[in-house]
């Protein structure tokens, strides 16, 4: 196999990716490591992270602002898909991986690199997402995965990094693994590995506790056009602004925490903690608006599509033919998803209290009402029921037991 001379490394500044830099150079004999830091709205000082990569031995360190692309190309399609893996997790972390992988491949092309690398461990989901996306976009590129091969625990990786002057950003006694982007935070490891251990309050940053959330409810309205959120409380916003505002409103009222047992791609169950206040709020509102603007059979079948969409994105198949086909179906359903949804935020809850669509509502007052304005033809119900239940009645007559 040809010796790799230049590699592009997905870099976060955390333990694993920081240790990857000296490890790639020392153990793999790679002469040039270029790091890529993705700005996904995580709120960190990315210039410090870029400098840390250079101090750790990177020949170049690139920061890419991907926030707009992340929201418009990844988060908003997930909202249209009502994407909830295992009916709970809105894919806040999973959505970022194919975007990062896409940029890794582009940078590798730009700098004529032989390979790309990431710091994912051998039993996580991200390794699958990165590898599948890279193979789809750059099948000729070699993928190097040091953390999958070095057999070091997190504590040992911290010690290895310290030998090369790399400071660890976590406590050795409580090494939580935290991933942050504009859509939310994921927290794992440490005492959270005990599924009966309550998550300590100090791990949360985007959401208030129930005790600290306001004692008065807040009613908000979310506006949609073609299935995309476009405004909150009559204020029309950019996609990024909508996510930010939804995060603040929902998070302040304690909505958006997820504590779940998750079925990982590699076959194990893991305990995961997520904070995704804005994304969960927008998905909830979008799904509610669909209930008044889509035909029942579309809603029913779209539910099947949504589940599959969430599964394949979680499993790493963002760049694939099935995902493209599901996207096409979802997109075809969204032209009528226009209107607004009223939600009450209170003490960890987001309660739908109203929904309307001026031009696309399938709800008709004159058919739904029980008042004198009712135009529903009640007399036709008997014939409908007779035909609707015919097959069941025939079965019952055939199988009923008669008594003398």
Swiss-Prot record:
Question: Where is the protein localized?
Answer: Cytoplasm
Name the positions where ATP binds.
10-18, 38, 119
Which SUPFAM superfamilies would you find in this protein's record? Adenine nucleotide alpha hydrolases-like, Argininosuccinate synthetase, C-terminal domain
Q: Tell me where it mainly resides.
A: cytoplasm
Q: Which Gene3D superfamilies match?
A: Argininosuccinate synthetase, chain A, domain 2, HUPs, Single helix bin
CDD domains linked: ASS
Which EC number(s) are documented for this chain?
6.3.4.5
* Gene Ontology CC terms, in alphabetical order: cytoplasm
Q: Which domain of life is it from?
A: Bacteria
Q: Does the keyword Phosphoprotein apply?
A: no
Question: What reaction gets catalysed by this protein?
Answer: L-citrulline + L-aspartate + ATP = 2-(N(omega)-L-arginino)succinate + AMP + diphosphate + H(+)
Detail which positions bind L-aspartate.
121, 125-126
Q: Which UniProt keywords apply?
A: Amino-acid biosynthesis, Arginine biosynthesis, ATP-binding, Cytoplasm, Ligase, Nucleotide-binding
The protein's GO terms of the molecular function aspect are: argininosuccinate synthase activity; ATP binding
* InterPro entries, per database record: Arginosuc_syn_C (IPR048268), Arginosuc_syn_N (IPR048267), Arginosuc_synth (IPR001518), Arginosuc_synth_CS (IPR018223), Arginosuc_synth_type_1_subfam (IPR023434), AS_cat/multimer_dom_body (IPR024074), Rossmann-like_a/b/a_fold (IPR014729)
Q: Which residues bind L-citrulline?
A: 89, 125, 129, 177, 186, 262, 274
Its GO biological process annotations read:
argininosuccinate metabolic process; L-arginine biosynthetic process; urea cycle
Associated pathway: Amino-acid biosynthesis; L-arginine biosynthesis; L-arginine from L-ornithine and carbamoyl phosphate: step 2/3
Q: What class of enzyme is it?
A: ligase
For the keyword RNA-binding, the answer is: no
* NCBIfam families the UniProt entry points to: argG, PRK00509.1
Q: Which family does it belong to?
A: Belongs to the argininosuccinate synthase family. Type 1 subfamily.
Q: How does it assemble?
A: Homotetramer.
Report the protein name in the record. Argininosuccinate synthase
Organism equals: Prochlorococcus marinus (strain MIT 9215)
What phylogenetic lineage does the species belong to? Bacteria, Bacillati, Cyanobacteriota, Cyanophyceae, Synechococcales
Supply the gene name.
argG
């Amino acid at each position: 196999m040809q010796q790799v001379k230049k590699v592009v490394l997905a870099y976060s500044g955390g333990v694993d990716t920081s240790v990857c830099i000296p490890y790639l150079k020392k153990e793999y004999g790679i002469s040039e490591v270029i790091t890529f830091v993705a700005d996904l709205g995580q709120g960190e000082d990315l210039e410090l992270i870029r400098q840390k990569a250079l101090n750790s031995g990177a020949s170049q360190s690139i920061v890419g602002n991907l926030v707009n692309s992340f929201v418009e190309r990844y988060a908003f399609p997930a909202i249209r898909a009502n994407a909830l893996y295992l009916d709970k997790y809105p894919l806040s972390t999973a959505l970022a991986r194919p975007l990062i992988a896409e940029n890794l491949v582009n940078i590798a092309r730009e700098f004529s690199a032989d390979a790309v690398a990431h710091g994912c461990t051998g039993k996580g989901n991200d390794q699958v997402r990165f590898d599948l996306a890279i193979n789809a976009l750059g099948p000729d590129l070699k993928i190097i995965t040091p953390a999958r091969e070095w057999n070091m625990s997190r504590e040992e990786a911290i010690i290895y990094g310290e030998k090369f002057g790399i400071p660890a950003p976590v406590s050795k006694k409580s090494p939580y693994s935290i991933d942050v982007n504009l859509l939310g935070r994921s927290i794992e490891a440490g005492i959270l590995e005990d599924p009966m251990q309550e998550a300590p309050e100090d791990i949360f940053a985007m959401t208030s506790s129930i005790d600290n959330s306001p004692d008065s409810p807040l009613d908000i309205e979310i506006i949609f056009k073609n299935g995309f959120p476009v405004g909150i409380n009559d204020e029309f916003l950019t996609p990024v602004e909508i996510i930010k505002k939804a995060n603040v409103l929902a998070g302040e009222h304690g909505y958006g925490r997820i504590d779940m047992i998750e079925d990982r791609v590699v076959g194990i169950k893991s305990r995961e903690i997520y904070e995704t206040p804005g994304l969960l709020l927008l998905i909830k509102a979008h799904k509610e608006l669909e209930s008044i603007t889509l035909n029942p059979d579309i809603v029913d079948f779209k539910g099947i599509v949504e589940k599959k969409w969430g599964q394949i994105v979680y499993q790493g198949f963002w760049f694939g033919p099935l995902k493209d086909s599901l996207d096409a179906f979802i997109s075809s359903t969204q032209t009528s998803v226009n209107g607004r949804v009223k939600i009450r935020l209170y003490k960890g809850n987001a309660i739908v209290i109203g929904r309307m669509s001026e031009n696309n509502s399938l709800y008709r007052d004159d058919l739904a009402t029980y008042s004198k304005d009712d135009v529903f033809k009640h007399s036709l119900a008997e014939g409908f029921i007779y035909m609707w239940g015919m097959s069941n009645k025939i079965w019952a007559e055939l199988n009923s037991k008669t008594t003398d």
